Amino acid sequence: MRVLISAVGDTDPFRNFHDGSLIHIARKYRPEKVILIFSEHTAKKQGNIEKALFSIAPNYEPELIIHDPIISDNEVHIFDVMFQRFSDILQEYYTKEDEFILNLSSATPQIKSALFVINRLNGINVKAVQVSSPEHASNENIGHDNDENIDELIEVNKDNKVNFIDRTIEDNAEKFSQALLKKTARDFIEKFDYKAALDILDQLSDFPNLKSVREEIRDVVNCLSKQDVPKGLRHKKLKEEEQKILSAYLTIELQRERGNVSESFIRIKNLTEFILEDYIEKRYPGLIDEYCEDIQKYYLSLFDYSKLLKATKEFKLKRTIAPIIDMNSSRNKVAHSLSPLDSDAVKQLGIAMKTLKTLVREQYHFSQSDFNFYHDLNKILLTKLN
């Protein structure tokens, strides 16, 4: 069965010697059932709507269902309320066995907008239809025929003929769907969730800049998964080792931005140990090897590096890394157990991140522009996705 669901608006049933949207859709598709949704304001039209529908053709007598309750005039101009109300109405009447048609052109702008969005977001199979004005332009200044005699309006209706001009437009949601996907991708980029953004972008139809955006994000995603250096960082005038250090630090920043606190804890200690090893090796060649032989260890912990800094009287650097050492017990708790993080541990992470940034900046003299790499990348990507 073909079923039309329609609100009733001021242009229904007729306006300016032509069908209103409701009657015109019924004329085109001839639904066997018409579900009518009235407001307090339009409820007085019920008799005229019924007469107009039955006038479409001599043998056309659709089943009419008047939805109850009538919508309050106080609510018809509130989008959120109309969105929920019409979502519920559609779910109430929808069946997979029937073919449903949704009128997108009757009633208040808020109701039409709500139906427009519902059509694109509900995920159920309905045919949504808009109706253009007979002039194919705004009918804002054209009066309503609400007070005219319905029988006379039917008689003079220019659409009331077999070869009427079809003004229906079936609403294909593809364009909106693409816009919604693009917005979702932008939201993921702003949250630094590049993998999720790429998954969305791979679903988009081609448009200018899409290919380059995909390539840039795919490079970042691949590098993050392999702990490699993104192409944008490789193009900076930095030594290979500096590129790796900066990339590792920025990866930790990304994890924190995305709320992955546990991963940030684990990575901070590893990067700090790498930086301290590099620092000591450059200034005190052979010291680490001697220390490892003495204690018979092949892997030095953060505590070991702290002892070496004390032995070499690198007290300033030892003080600099103190917050990271304090954080280490919380880090171990996360890494080696299922214990949740408490608020103090999260606070420690913020302090440790500032410490790590200071350490990285002082040891490798990176500029603020270097630290802004992903923020700047996001600006470029978002501009291309406008």
Curated annotation (Swiss-Prot):
<comment type="function">
    <text>Csm functions as a non-specific ssDNase. Base-pairing between crRNA and target RNA to form a ternary Csm complex activates a ssDNase activity; target RNA cleavage suppresses the ssDNase, a temporal control that prevents uncontrolled DNA degradation. Viral RNA transcripts probably tether the Csm complex to the viral genome, recruiting Cas10 ssDNA activity which is able to degrade DNA in the transcription bubble, spatially controlling the DNase activity.</text>
</comment>
<keyword id="KW-0051">Antiviral defense</keyword>
<protein>
    <recommendedName>
        <fullName>CRISPR system endoribonuclease Csm6'</fullName>
        <ecNumber>3.1.-.-</ecNumber>
    </recommendedName>
</protein>
<keyword id="KW-0255">Endonuclease</keyword>
<dbReference type="GO" id="GO:0051607">
    <property type="term" value="P:defense response to virus"/>
</dbReference>
<dbReference type="InterPro" id="IPR053941">
    <property type="entry name" value="Csm6_HEPN"/>
</dbReference>
<comment type="similarity">
    <text>Belongs to the CRISPR-associated Csm6 family.</text>
</comment>
<dbReference type="GO" id="GO:0003723">
    <property type="term" value="F:RNA binding"/>
</dbReference>
<keyword id="KW-0547">Nucleotide-binding</keyword>
<dbReference type="InterPro" id="IPR013489">
    <property type="entry name" value="CRISPR-assoc_prot_Csm6"/>
</dbReference>
<feature type="region of interest" description="HEPN domain">
    <location>
        <begin position="147"/>
        <end position="386"/>
    </location>
</feature>
<dbReference type="Pfam" id="PF09659">
    <property type="entry name" value="Cas_Csm6_HEPN"/>
</dbReference>
<keyword id="KW-0378">Hydrolase</keyword>
<dbReference type="GO" id="GO:0000166">
    <property type="term" value="F:nucleotide binding"/>
</dbReference>
<comment type="subunit">
    <text>Homodimer. The composite ssRNase active site is formed at the dimer interface.</text>
</comment>
<keyword id="KW-0694">RNA-binding</keyword>
<feature type="region of interest" description="CARF domain">
    <location>
        <begin position="1"/>
        <end position="146"/>
    </location>
</feature>
<dbReference type="GO" id="GO:0004519">
    <property type="term" value="F:endonuclease activity"/>
</dbReference>
<comment type="function">
    <text>CRISPR (clustered regularly interspaced short palindromic repeat) is an adaptive immune system that provides protection against mobile genetic elements (viruses, transposable elements and conjugative plasmids). CRISPR clusters contain spacers, sequences complementary to antecedent mobile elements, and target invading nucleic acids. CRISPR clusters are transcribed and processed into CRISPR RNA (crRNA). The type III-A Csm complex binds crRNA and acts as a crRNA-guided RNase, DNase and cyclic oligoadenylate synthase; binding of target RNA cognate to the crRNA is required for all activities.</text>
</comment>
<dbReference type="Pfam" id="PF22208">
    <property type="entry name" value="Cas_Csm6_CARF"/>
</dbReference>
<keyword id="KW-0540">Nuclease</keyword>
<dbReference type="InterPro" id="IPR053955">
    <property type="entry name" value="Csm6_CARF"/>
</dbReference>
